[in-house]
């Protein structure tokens, strides 16, 4: 058998191809391409959404613009409808041959810059006289009423007077009066005819001349016009206004003090009118026409004034509240104009006219017939119509004017007091003066029952000359401190001290904070809740950050508290008595006698051997007796079946002041008997004694007291 041929050698393995790496790269590229496509798709969707939102925004803008135009058109239509319902017409009365005033000729443009009154007052009065003369000449034939405005002038420079339809609707009586006047003019002189024609021409402007006051009364606004000073006076508030041509509104000029204040009856009537205004706001227009008609029947003489300030009389109803309170007789008024004062006899004349009207009312105070309209009814209806006119903007403007007219109130907050609650609020108004004192029967506004407060300590009232609240100390015993300064001397009635916002007044031990705000405005410092919350926070901080007391200070505090307790129970004059009961002669100590006669046995003997894990418990042991009664026998384990532990628990010693697990415990046998410090000292003393006195022998220990060690038995 031939030998087998050797097998050919194995070929080396082929080299690894780079295909797997290319495949991985291709997969990564495909994955990135897919992500890129998804990102592009998301970008396209976002662009579509953006275009869609832009279209929606454009549509919304166009819709809003259309709605704005529609609202403007509807508002114009509504305004025209209201004008038609009110039957008002625009009438422009030309009373001058020359061009109207320009802004540069306006009197009040340089009013506050000049020290004295400008010379234009006389020029304006001359122009008014010329205007009246031209109106008289034109009224000889017929009254020329032009409906076209002056050419080439601004709308604000034209003198417009809105004539309400009620001048013609209820004009039966004035028409008959004019007819009688025309018949009487035929036989009268030329001067009387010219005067009557002038009055008839000016009557259409809404002004009537009051002979008693020498001023012109406007029925549309309720103001008196002073032609000399070119000011408008509101008798209900005592404010002088001037007409601003640029804004077309009445601007505040000055104010006079009205004394006395309105009575309670007038306040009640105002409240009733405000209630009517809230209940029936829709009937304002009808009431306005009705009451204006009733007022126009009482107009008896008119003068025409052709100045640009009379342009917006009807709009003034929305700027200031009109009330027929000019029947009250205020004092004589001086109007301040840039340093000089212009005396105006307005209030004297008004008082004379009111007295004349009151006499007339008393004369005709008879029982009215059915359907007859009295003067009081017309005045009340006119006042109700004026107060009921306007909208929310008018009410806001009235509130602002009232806030400016009436002085603010004082909100008094108790900051610190031993008798009053901290954070209490007291309100002081300008109507009645406020008093501060201790007496209970005097009905003080702010009563402080302290010893350091006088019966009538101080008074606070509103000074109309200074236009501020003042504090007057009534000669108190301890005086008054304002802002930490003793400005009010004790026992002397001092001069009035002007109070300002934020002043702190200390009366006795009570500290008061005065807050003065216009209207109903408040701050955090005059709100009782805010003040008490801050005080509570301060108390908490003080309790947490209290100072640490030393040993001596604590002892002083203890003695102080002990004295308080003695004073509380009436023991401040008695000393401390120890065993007061035993010292009582009637007390018998029976327990002491029994101890002396019978004595007492200790259940625990001091010579008992201590327990040990190496010695057996004796039969007299209480624990062993208890176990035997329960069924335990010597040599058995514990438990019901006797399978419990038989050996005692080993004693383990640990280091002092060390917790469990800190170190390895040691048994009792490994620890030597350590002698305490006292025994060591005695041993040292014995050694010294034996060295000094060797002939004496130390006493041996008592053989009965042997230490218990391992292996010892009883």
Curated annotation (Swiss-Prot):
It comes from the Eukaryota. Widely expressed. Expressed in endothelial cells, vascular smooth muscle cells and osteoblasts. Expressed in umbilical vein endothelial cells and microvascular endothelial cells. SMART domains: FHA, G_patch. Signal peptide: none annotated. The modification N6-acetyllysine is found at residue 664. The modification N-acetylalanine is found at residue 2. Residues 1-18 have a biased composition (Pro residues). One of its GO terms (biological process) is vasculogenesis. GO terms for cellular component: cytoplasm; extracellular region; perinuclear region of cytoplasm. Keywords: Acetylation, Angiogenesis, Coiled coil, Cytoplasm, Developmental protein, Differentiation, Phosphoprotein, Secreted. Residues 1-22, 259-307, 322-384, 586-617, 655-714 are annotated as: Disordered. Its main location: cytoplasm. It is found in: Cytoplasm; Secreted. Residues 18-88 form a coiled coil. Residues 335-355 have a biased composition (Polar residues). GO terms for molecular function: identical protein binding; nucleic acid binding. SUPFAM superfamilies: SMAD/FHA domain. The modification Phosphoserine is found at residues 7, 11, 344. Residues 279-298, 586-609, 680-690 have a biased composition (Basic and acidic residues). Residues 619-665 form the G-patch domain. Interacts with the secreted angiogenic factor TNFSF12. Promotes angiogenesis and the proliferation of endothelial cells. Able to bind to endothelial cells and promote cell proliferation, suggesting that it may act in an autocrine fashion. PANTHER family: ANGIOGENIC FACTOR WITH G PATCH AND FHA DOMAINS 1. This is Angiogenic factor with G patch and FHA domains 1. It comes from Homo sapiens.
